[in-house]
Regions:
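A surface-exposed partner-binding patch
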Residues: 1-132, 280
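Long, contiguous interaction/recruitment modules in multidomain scaffold/adaptor proteins
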Residues: 128, 138-221, 225-226
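Intrinsically disordered, low-complexity regulatory segments in ankyrin-centric signaling systems
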Residues: 200-265
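Ankyrin-repeat boundary/"N-cap" motif
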Residues: 242-254, 276-287, 308-317
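Ankyrin-repeat C-terminal turn/loop position
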Residues: 272, 305-306
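Ankyrin-repeat-protein effector appendages
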Residues: 318-330
Length: 330
């Protein structure tokens, strides 16, 4: 997206930034040479160019997009709401997260009986509080610049969620990470209250105070947001849904969460597989049970949909005795 000097000034005045088609709000000023030098001194290799490109756009801020991470077959909704920066009011600021990683690296070296040179191989740059973190590999070699995702495991009582700390390689570089950001629901639809993009949309609304130039820029930014909406309906209408993994998963999830048996039938006829994993390791049956869509759950069982080991626990708050007994028998 090409921006005029006047538009860049408006973005700066409203603490907004655009990076690889995504809008950052509460955006911080570009990184200084002094900060780059201080960061580089503690790393095992050079700061990857894509991360520098992001930081030269904004050295921190907030994001309002959906991101899914596949942890060895467990589909996890990853909270990527923060781009860490110095002196932020988050759980830790950037320096705090770097010090946290240094402490962990030193402890690991001591436990393994080896020396550590004090240089980080992986630099934390974003995530959400203490629950999710994104790192970029700074160690020289074929993985230099790759983005790594880490998520904190939750107690077993959180049925269907990650129960152990998990890590995976997510993207080749920071630009690749930003290309994964999307909206699973239309953020402009008033029925999608409390959505992931609510604060982002409020930040765009503030542009209207700048008069016609601000309204025009807001419109351009909204176009960028609309390009990230994952709408499965056109693909269902034109017959291409089965060939679009992310769209068909969202379609199945919405049908299951709404308990829409007619739509489930249409999706099956369109080539969607009821055995496909949608969230965690669960599929359409677990999505129905989690929302208490018991009629749809019974229908799925009638179609031969397999029961997972945690299906009963996922639906425990909604199940009646007959359906619980049926699940136990399968």
């Amino acid at each position: 997206m090409e921006l005029s000097p006047a538009e860049r000034q408006l973005l700066l005045a409203h603490r907004l930034a655009v990076f690889d088609g995504c809008v950052v709000y509460d955006a911080q000023p570009p990184v200084s040479a002094e900060h780059v030098q201080r960061l580089a001194e503690g790393l095992a290799g050079p700061i990857p160019e894509d991360l520098l490109r992001l930081w030269r756009t904004c050295f921190g801020g907030r994001l309002g997009y959906d991101l899914e991470v596949d942890y060895d077959g467990h589909r996890h909704p990853f909270s990527f709401s923060e781009l860490f920066y110095p002196d932020s009011d988050g759980y830790h600021d950037l320096w705090g997260w770097i010090e946290h990683e240094r402490e962990l690296a030193a402890e690991a070296a001591t436990e393994e009986g080896r020396d550590w040179n004090g240089k980080l191989a992986y630099l934390p740059f974003g995530g959400f509080e203490y629950l999710e973190r994104l790192y970029v590999c700074v160690e020289p070699g074929p993985e230099h610049g790759a983005v790594i995702a880490w998520s904190h495991g939750l107690p077993p009582a959180w049925a269907g969620r990650l129960h152990q700390d998990s890590v995976t390689r997510l993207a080749d570089d920071v630009g690749g990470l930003f290309r994964l950001l999307s909206f699973e629901q239309d953020p402009f639809d008033a029925e999608n209250a409390c959505g992931v993009a609510d604060e982002l949309l409020e930040a765009l609304d503030a542009l209207e105070a700048a008069g016609e130039p601000g309204k025009a820029l807001k419109g351009r930014l909204e176009v960028l947001l609309r390009q990230r909406i994952l709408d499965w309906r056109p693909a269902l209408a034109d017959g291409s849904l089965a060939a679009e993994p992310r769209l068909r998963q969202l379609a199945l999830a919405e049908a299951a969460q709404d308990g829409d048996i007619d739509l489930l039938q249409r999706l099956r006829d369109a080539g969607c597989d009821f055995a496909e994993t949608l969230r965690g390791r669960g599929g359409v049956l677990e999505a129905c049970l989690a929302r208490g869509r018991l009629e749809a759950a019974r229908w799925l069982l009638d179609q031969g949909v397999a029961v997972h080991q945690d299906s009963l626990q996922i639906g425990a708050a909604h199940l009646d005795a007959l359906l619980a007994e049926r699940l136990l028998r399968l």
